[in-house]
Amino acid sequence: TFAGLVLLFVVCYASESEEKEFPKEMLSSIFAVDNDFKQEERDCAGYMRECKEKLCCSGYVRSSRWKWCVLPAPWRR
């Protein structure tokens, strides 16, 4: 029975780990930018755009959690 409990723990832990990554994956796919549909190339990243290599455009800040450019707000410090 101990082996069964260990197996149950491992399965539950793996499932929980996948659930933590799901929101990030879902949001990334929703806001993903397809390069074919870009009208112009910019030197900065706009609202809800990924900002790994580019800096955020004026008026936006980089979200520490999602690594996207978002509007500045008091709770995002």
Curated annotation (Swiss-Prot):
It is found in: Secreted. Residues 15-42 form a propeptide. InterPro entries: Huwentoxin-1. Its main location: secreted. The keyword Zinc does not apply. GO terms for molecular function: ion channel inhibitor activity; toxin activity. Residues 1-14 form the signal peptide. Disulfide bonds join 44-57, 56-69. GO terms for cellular component: extracellular region. Expressed by the venom gland. Keywords: Disulfide bond, Ion channel impairing toxin, Knottin, Secreted, Signal, Toxin. Belongs to the neurotoxin 10 (Hwtx-1) family. 51 (Hntx-8) subfamily. Hntx-8 sub-subfamily. Ion channel inhibitor. The presence of a 'disulfide through disulfide knot' structurally defines this protein as a knottin. This is U3-theraphotoxin-Hhn1k. It comes from Cyriopagopus hainanus.
